[in-house]
A protein has these predicted regions:
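Arginine residue identity/basic-tract feature
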Residues: 19, 66, 79, 152, ...
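Amphipathic alpha-helical assembly segments used for oligomerization, scaffolding, or translocation
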Residues: 1-69
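Extracytoplasmic/secreted envelope proteins and their assembly/folding machinery
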Residues: 48, 73, 77-80, 150-153, ...
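Short, solvent-exposed recognition patches
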Residues: 76-163
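Surface-exposed beta-loop interaction hotspot
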Residues: 63-83
């Protein structure tokens, strides 16, 4: 919305800067003066550059929104695999899903758990990353719509600060819920979430 508004403002500025042709003066001297003024060139380059810049920003914003709305499993894995601090990734399947929500009504269409190098994996129970769950690092849940992601985020909020039931940090990016382990510090959670967000938004 902001990029669209900024583009509209730039277009309006350019419209306001356009030279208007005045009514024909009655006096010859006034006609000569008006003619000289109209012959003077106007530099519209700054307005054109501003419009191009805002248009490019809008186009990029649209592309980014497409990336983070109902993302595919392969897209998420490809992006987060290179995030600093993530040591491994594993996607859930319908046969191997702790929550049993994959592809169900109201559930996620992609769910990728990841391990963090900041956490001692030997101290987290489970045979693989999915079994260890968010405790070993975190999870990326992709939903068909933003509304479904928000509903999931609200549900997770009910467990904030609930000790062993605390599900860690959870933030929305488009129709994605980015979760990080409760065993990480608040700063580590925030930094990891930021790095993941940047990778998911990156235009390649």
């Amino acid at each position: 919305e902001n990029t669209m508004s900024e583009l509209k403002v730039s277009i309006a500025d350019a419209e306001n800067a356009k030279r208007t042709v005045p009514e024909l003066p009655s006096k010859t001297s006034d006609i000569i003066s008006a003619t000289k003024m109209l012959k003077e060139p106007i530099d519209y380059s700054s307005f054109i550059d501003a419009i191009k810049e805002k248009q490019s920003a809008l186009e990029n914003s649209i592309l980014q929104m497409r990336q983070i709305t109902a993302p595919t499993e392969s897209f998420v894995i490809q992006r987060i695999a290179d995030v600093e601090g993530i040591s491994g990734v594993q996607a859930v399947t319908e046969d191997h899903d702790p929550n049993g929500n994959l592809n169900k009504a109201g559930g996620y269409t992609a769910c990728i758990y990841f391990s963090s190098s900041l956490i001692n994996q030997d101290e987290v129970f489970g045979n693989d990353i999915v079994e260890k769950g968010t405790d070993c690092g975190g999870c990326i849940e992709g939903y068909p719509t933003i509304e479904e992601a928000e509903k999931r985020n609200t549900y997770l909020s009910a467990f904030d600060g609930a000790g062993m039931l605390d599900s860690g940090s959870h933030n929305i990016l488009g129709s994605i819920v980015i979760r990080t382990s409760r065993t990480l510090t608040a700063t580590q959670q925030s930094e990891l979430t930021q790095k993941i967000s940047e990778k998911l938004l990156e235009l390649q």
